[in-house]
């Protein structure tokens, strides 16, 4: 009995106890799984109900948000929301129309002859010695809150004379106790234009501005001399350089007329100047911000205009976590602007005029999160966690439309979820280029070398079958093969017109351009000194380096593999040197690239904006310009200078035709393709209209957070039946184990009790 009784109590403690513990553990596990399944949102609970737009950025944080230096599309997603150039573009009207932003009106230049006497508006370009723009500033415009403007009760700046200790570990302007503001004045625009003569940071459009802004070249030389004096006794690698105060030195080409008027003086006639005034390069910069960020420790703490811009626009940077997250919030000092009431005929039907006259911006916060690969970005959009995939990239609508075309199930899902993919025909291009400073593919040191290198470039240009690659294979990001540098839709472009083609890469067959056979490219390669892709003298294989501006993720690997196959047609080995965009920028600035991949989204609607990408003085490696190929041809450069003063008309067309022909023959680019464009929006995002030129789009967008919350819950409802089934199976296993264990214990107890009659 003792044994039996003892055995029974032991089973309760050592049998029921563990079973109950296991059961409790399994229950807790199931509850935890169910709870986690209820919400897979990447944001804190309740974020979907806030008036915040969520979207993503690629790979790395923007490198330059300083408006003097910033000239990359990923950076425009921030600069155009924060800064306000003098002009902008009407959001809805096409063709594009300039409208005033921080200026109170769009002004026409006054023309002067060499004696300073006024000329009529229709004066011939050769008679115009000077163009004068008197630009009125919108009154009452206030800067965002920032410690650079903060003053004490005596009117003294609180934070413009700090030492390293006073800064401490502050890494955000918002960490300072006091914030201030002030009104926008004409001096801020003059200061901004002067900054293009800086020696401290990259100034990519200095070479363009210096050709036209009166005395800007001499001013740059003066600034360089003065800066050398400031830095003379300091270590060369010092981060904390003393404040370079451009107010000290006057510039004849940019002056203050009065508090609310500034004057620009240009040499000759340059009609495109008004377009430059719609870009952040001429957005106002308060000297206080420049002085604030020049103080000791600021650079070390990541405090500069490149991370923390200071503007008058609808948004301001409130969070900058490098390579993770950026947040822009509504600028409390922004004056507000009315949503447009005028648009194209189709805009009314699309609902784009429903907010006519209402005050913008409509959205309180813009939260941008890093997403390194395309697949998770697309999935989060389909789940409703991104309102748009990326705000600045114009190809997402094409990608999603291609997915829908390839699958009826995908098409039904997209339609059921109300995704919107508006398409556009806009002005941009992608191209493969050659660094003309390179000893193998470049200009060459002698006429003989020049001829051979040109034939090598031409052979490669023939071999790359853009029609196949980006017309058929990569249709989700493709377009129409380019025959020259000027995209369709601009005056002067002949792309797509009957009889126009690139004679180097194509020939006419039945009146249509057809790519030349690979035999033509192979023959050119022989003349270039590389028969079969080998050096005719040494017999060594020709190996070329391809600098790609993105890290190789799965979606880019197939494209780069395809590109390598194009070179392999000629027996040329292509080494892929892929980097992130910031490293790519460094490499091209230093001239260390050989063959490269690049694209251009129009800054303004004029062929000149694409033809300047091959203008010699605009060299990337020599002048920090946007001529990444570092191409220089005296005939082309002379035509470009002539082009700059021409209005649309036969004379301008003739000049463009000559420039295109030169670029085709010299082949500094293998050209590429003009991409199809389209955006992607959730159903709760309204007022979305695709455009390459309009980058301050966020203020026009409107959200319906309540609808977003409902749809996110609907689209991400947890699928719990597999977990219930797993739980049932686990419970059944526990029950079976308990029953088996109990049976064994019972059998053991019976063997331990003596049989009847035994003592």
Which residues fall in each region the model found?
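Extracytoplasmic/periplasmic ligand-capture domains
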Residues: 37-46, 91-92, 135, 139-202, ...
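Bacterial N-terminal signal peptides
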Residues: 23-35
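Residue-level recognition of beta-strand termini and adjacent short loop/turns
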Residues: 127-129, 258, 322
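Extracytoplasmic/lumenal ectodomains and periplasmic regions of secretory and membrane proteins
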Residues: 657, 661-693
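N-terminal lobe/hinge region of extracytoplasmic solute-binding protein
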Residues: 56-125, 310
């Amino acid at each position: 009995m003792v044994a039996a009784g003892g055995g029974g109590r032991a089973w309760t403690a050592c049998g029921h106890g563990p079973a109950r513990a296991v059961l409790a553990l399994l229950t807790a596990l199931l509850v935890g799984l169910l709870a986690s399944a209820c919400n897979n949102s990447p944001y804190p609970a309740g974020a979907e109900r806030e008036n915040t737009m969520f979207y993503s950025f690629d790979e790395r944080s923007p490198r330059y948000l300083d408006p003097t230096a910033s000239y990359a599309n990923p950076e425009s997603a921030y600069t155009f929301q924060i800064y306000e150039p003098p002009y902008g573009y009407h959001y809805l009207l096409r063709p594009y129309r300039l409208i005033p932003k921080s200026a109170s009106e769009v002004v026409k230049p006054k023309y002067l002859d060499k004696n300073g006497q006024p000329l009529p508006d229709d004066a011939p370009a050769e008679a115009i010695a000077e163009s004068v723009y008197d630009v009125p500033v919108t009154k009452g415009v206030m800067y965002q809150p920032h410690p650079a403007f903060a003053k004490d009760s005596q009117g003294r700046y609180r934070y413009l004379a700090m030492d390293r200790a006073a800064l401490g570990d502050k890494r955000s302007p918002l960490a300072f106790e006091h914030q201030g503001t002030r009104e926008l004045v004409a001096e801020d625009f003059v200061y901004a234009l002067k900054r293009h003569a800086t020696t401290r940071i990259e100034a990519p459009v200095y070479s363009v501005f210096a050709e036209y802004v009166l005395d800007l070249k001499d001013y740059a030389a003066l600034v360089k001399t003065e800066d050398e004096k400031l830095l003379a006794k300091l270590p060369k690698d010092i981060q904390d350089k003393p404040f370079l105060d451009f107010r000290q030195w006057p510039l004849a080409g940019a002056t203050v007329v009065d508090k609310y008027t500034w004057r620009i003086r240009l040499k000759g006639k340059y009609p495109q100047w008004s377009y430059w005034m719609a870009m952040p390069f001429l957005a106002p910069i308060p000297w206080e911000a420049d002085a604030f960020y020049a103080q000791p420790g600021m650079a070390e703490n990541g405090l500069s205009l490149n991370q923390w811009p200071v503007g008058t626009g609808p948004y301001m940077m409130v969070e900058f976590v490098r390579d993770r997250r950026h947040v822009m919030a509504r600028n409390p000092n922004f004056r507000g602007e009315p949503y447009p009431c005028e648009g194209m005929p189709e805009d009314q039907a699309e609902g784009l005029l429903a907010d006519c006259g209402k005050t913008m911006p409509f959205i309180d916060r813009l939260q941008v999160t890093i997403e390194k690969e395309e697949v998770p970005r697309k999935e989060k959009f389909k789940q409703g966690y991104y309102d748009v995939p990326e705000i600045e990239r114009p190809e997402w609508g094409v990608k999603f439309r291609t997915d829908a075309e390839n699958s009826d199930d995908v098409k039904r899902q997209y339609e059921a979820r109300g995704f919107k993919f508006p398409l556009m025909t806009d002005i941009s291009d992608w191209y493969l280029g050659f660094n003309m400073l390179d000893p193998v593919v470049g200009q060459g040191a002698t006429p003989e070398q020049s001829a051979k290198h040109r034939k090598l470039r031409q052979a490669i240009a023939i071999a790359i079958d853009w029609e196949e690659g980006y017309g058929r294979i990569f249709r989700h990001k493709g377009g129409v093969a380019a025959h020259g540098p000027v995209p369709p839709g601009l005056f002067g472009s002949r792309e797509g017109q009957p009889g126009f083609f690139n004679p180097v890469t194509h020939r006419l067959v039945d009146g249509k351009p057809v790519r030349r056979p690979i035999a033509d490219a192979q023959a050119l390669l022989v003349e270039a000194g590389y028969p079969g892709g080998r050096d005719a003298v040494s017999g060594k294989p020709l190996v070329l380096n391809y600098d790609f501006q993105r890290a190789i993720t799965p979606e880019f690997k197939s494209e780069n593999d395809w590109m390598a196959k194009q070179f392999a047609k000629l027996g040329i080995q292509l080494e892929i040197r892929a980097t992130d965009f910031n490293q790519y920028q460094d490499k091209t600035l230093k001239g260390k690239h050989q063959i490269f991949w690049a694209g251009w989204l129009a800054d303004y609607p004029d062929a000149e904006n694409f033809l300047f990408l091959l203008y010699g003085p605009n060299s990337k490696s020599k002048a920090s310009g946007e001529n990444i190929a570092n191409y220089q041809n005296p005939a082309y450069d002379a035509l470009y200078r002539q082009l700059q003063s021409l209005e649309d008309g036969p004379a301008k067309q003739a000049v463009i035709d000559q420039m295109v022909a030169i670029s085709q023959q010299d082949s500094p680019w293998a050209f590429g393709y003009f991409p199809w464009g389209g955006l992607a929006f959730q159903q709760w995002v309204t007022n979305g209209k695709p455009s390459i030129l309009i980058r301050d789009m966020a203020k026009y967008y409107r959200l319906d957070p309540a609808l977003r919350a409902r749809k996110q819950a609907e689209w991400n409802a947890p699928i719990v039946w597999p977990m219930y089934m797993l739980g049932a199976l686990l419970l059944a296993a526990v029950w079976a184990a308990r029953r088996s264990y109990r049976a064994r214990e019972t059998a053991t107890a019976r063997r331990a009790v003596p049989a009847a009659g035994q003592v």
